[in-house]
Curated annotation (Swiss-Prot):
Cell location: Cell membrane
Gene from which this protein is expressed: AQY3
Function in brief: Channel protein that mediates glycerol entry under ethanol stimulation. Does not seem to mediate glycerol uptake under standard conditions.
Comp. bias (Polar residues): 190-201
Protein name as it appears in the record: Aquaglycerol porin AQY3
Family annotation (Gene3D superfamilies): Glycerol uptake facilitator protein
GO biological process, one term: transmembrane transport
Xref: InterPro entries: Aquaporin-like, MIP, MIP/Aquaporin, MIP_CS
Length: 646
């Protein structure tokens, strides 16, 4: 190691290494060939270099010094020499490209391919709250992926939508139009009877001079016609300004020229019905219907026919022009990749009900057959009750997001009566449910065919012992009244509890938990109230397998059991019970106006419309009065109060 000094002699007297001597004041001096340094900064820097050298030496030799602390040095930023070059992102393990146009992206021959690859990978993000990866090109081929629907779904796995009745909506709009047509209810009206009116004595004198017979004098707006109402027969009377400006000579000449140009011997006009109104006419009507609240910001007030047209569009969107139609999707989404995709799009709701009911009946009928053909060793009454419950749960999960997962005609009819489910979808849903139950019973029967043959004693022997596993039949000692009310009570409990679980104003379960609770509800009804009649509570669950049973050996006798039980018991009891259960819940708990129980009368609608218009007027009138109050304060210094609603 060599040591330097600021003031060293030209030649060294000895080659002996210098020795350090530490003085009491902390200064370091060199003996023999080096003079003592008198500057503190030079000594400090020399000492620091020496300590750093010792630290490096200790690190190189593998040793460490615990008594000495090395100085901290800032980390140098590593500069990538290739930062300006295009570095393509290498896909992670398991990332493959199946399409031919994507296989070429694996080789990065030029910067353009790398840029395309980088853009491709940046688009592949997780969709929504799901952790599932969606390929960006998959999204291009499936535009509906991740798109939000703007249509109601009466699902049993989420709170029910709040849909207004079409007749009630039309009545609400009509009441609104009638209220706005009155002079005292128009926006911008300056009726003297209102608080905060800006009517002055000069206005009254001017109106009394030019008042026409048959007009109201209680409202200035009836004379001035500031609000251009639709269908007004009387032309508005324009008020002359107090300080009119004299027209110039040039203006008079222009007017006279126009009159000369437009003077013809023949006068003709086209009636309103002689041609269809064009887009320009509609725009001019809209401009005429513009209202100004503060003199600068125009506010467009929709025409009555426009309100009715919008309401018809909204209600038709809720009902759906066809089964499975969704109005929230763009025209690009309506292009289908193949022919079957188009069929599925228009029939996805019936398909969903079909699959949901099929899953329900497979589990339910399978549980019945397993407990019967094994003579209790393969199941019990409790196990078959849970089989029906979990089958119902899975059926709702299968169809809940598409059709709602009703899988029960009693539920569908109750939804149509009390929750404004479209009536034109009711028969389609019921037919799909019956067909799904038919195939579900057929699959369960085919699964247990060998066990049924062994239990019956031959392949051509079929009795009601196994037939009762496919369809319902009351016990022989149960009277018809008792059997009917068994189904009535069971279905009323089912539908009433469903209305409570699906009411967002009550205490709905968490997201996705409603179907699980419905499954436990069905199992509880079976274990507590299902022994005497095999708890039908679902007409489709009975009719579908009954039709199948009559076709495979049980014969028409399946329909004649217990005085045609399937008509008044399996269908009449559950449907009547479901309606009664929903009615009881709406009478005592539900407050939504979509239910016939809470349907508002004319007085309530007029009251609500009046309150809305009153609040709207005072909001606008308050703005105008504030502005006028500012102007008056500048002149008189008095404060003008804003009118308040009584």
């Amino acid at each position: 190691m060599s040591y330097e000094s600021g003031r060293s002699s030209s030649s060294s007297e000895s080659t002996r290494p210098p020795t350090l001597k530490e003085e009491p004041n902390g200064k370091i001096a060199w003996e023999e060939s080096v003079k003592k340094s008198r500057e503190n900064n030079e000594n400090d820097s020399t000492l620091l270099r020496r300590k750093l050298g010792e630290t490096r030496k200790a690190i190189e030799t593998g040793g460490s010094s615990r008594n000495k602390l090395s100085a901290l040095t800032p980390l140098k930023k590593v500069v990538d020499e290739r930062k300006d070059s295009v570095q393509p992102q290498v896909p992670s393990m398991g990332f493959t490209y199946s399409l031919p146009n994507l296989k070429t992206l694996n080789s990065f021959s030029d910067a353009e391919q790398a840029r395309i690859m980088q853009d491709y990978l940046s688009r592949g993000v997780n969709q929504g709250n799901s952790n599932n990866y969606v390929d960006p090109l998959y999204r291009q081929l499936n535009p509906t992926m991740g798109s939000s629907r703007n249509r109601p779904v009466w699902s049993l796995n989420q709170p029910l939508p709040h849909v207004l009745d079409r007749g009630l909506a039309a009545k609400m709009i009509q009441k609104n139009m009638d209220a706005r047509s009155r002079a005292s209810s128009r926006r911008g009206s300056t009726d003297i009877s209102r608080g905060g009116s800006t009517t002055s004595v000069k206005d009254w004198k001017r109106l009394l001079r030019g008042a026409a017979p048959g007009k109201k004098l209680g409202d200035i707006e009836a004379q001035t016609q500031r609000d251009n109402t639709v269908g007004a027969d009387v032309k508005p009377t324009k008020l002359e300004p107090e300080n009119p400006q004299k027209p110039s000579n040039t203006h008079i000449e222009n007017v006279s020229r126009k009159k000369k140009r437009t003077s013809h011997n023949v006068n003709f006009s086209l009636g309103d019905e002689s041609y269809a109104s064009s887009i320009a006419d509609a725009e001019s009507r809209k401009l005429k219907n513009m209202q100004t609240l503060d003199g600068s910001t125009p506010v467009y007030t929709k025409l009555p026919e426009e309100l009715i047209e919008e309401e018809n569009k909204s209600t038709s969107a809720l009902d759906g022009n066809e089964i499975g139609a969704s109005e929230d999707e763009d025209a690009d989404i309506m292009t289908f990749p193949n022919f079957w995709a188009k069929i599925r799009y228009h029939m996805r709701e019936p398909f969903a009900e079909f699959l949901g009911t099929l899953v329900l009946v497979i589990f339910g009928v399978g549980g019945n057959l397993q407990a019967t053909v094994t003579k209790g060793s393969g199941g019990s009454y409790e196990s078959l009750s849970f089989a029906w419950g979990f089958g119902c749960m899975l059926g709702v999960y299968v169809a809940g997001g598409i059709s709602g997962g009703h899988i029960n005609p009693a539920v569908t009819i109750s939804m149509a009566i009390f929750r404004k489910f479209p009536w034109k979808k009711v028969p389609v849903y019921i037919v799909a449910q019956i067909i799904g139950a038919y195939f579900g019973g057929a699959m369960a029967y085919g699964y247990f065919w060998s066990s049924i043959t062994e239990f019956e004693g031959g392949p051509h022997i079929r009795t009601t012992a196994t037939g009762a596993c496919l369809f319902t039949d009351p016990k022989s000692y149960v009277t018809w009244r008792n059997a009917f009310f068994d189904e009535f009570i069971g279905a009323s409990i089912l539908v009433g509890c469903l209305m409570a679980l699906l009411d967002d104003s009550n205490a709905p379960p968490g997201n996705g938990m409603t179907a699980l609770i419905i499954g436990f509800l069905v199992a509880a009804i079976g274990m507590a109230l299902g022994y005497q009649t095999s708890f039908t509570i679902n007409p489709a669950r009975d009719l579908g397998p009954r039709i199948f049973a009559s076709m495979i050996g049980y014969g028409p006798h399946a329909f004649h059991l217990t005085h045609w039980w399937w008509t008044w018991g399996a269908w009449g009891g559950p449907i009547a019970g479901g309606i009664a259960g929903a009615l009881i819940y709406d009478i005592f708990i539900f407050t939504g106006c979509e239910s016939p129980v809470n349907y508002p009368d004319n007085g309530y609608i007029e009251n609500r419309v009046g309150k809305l218009l009153h609040a709207e007027f005072h909001q606008n009138d308050g703005t105008v009065s504030d502005e006028s109050g500012v102007n008056s304060n500048s002149n008189t210094g008095s404060k003008k109060s804003v009118p308040t609603s009584s």
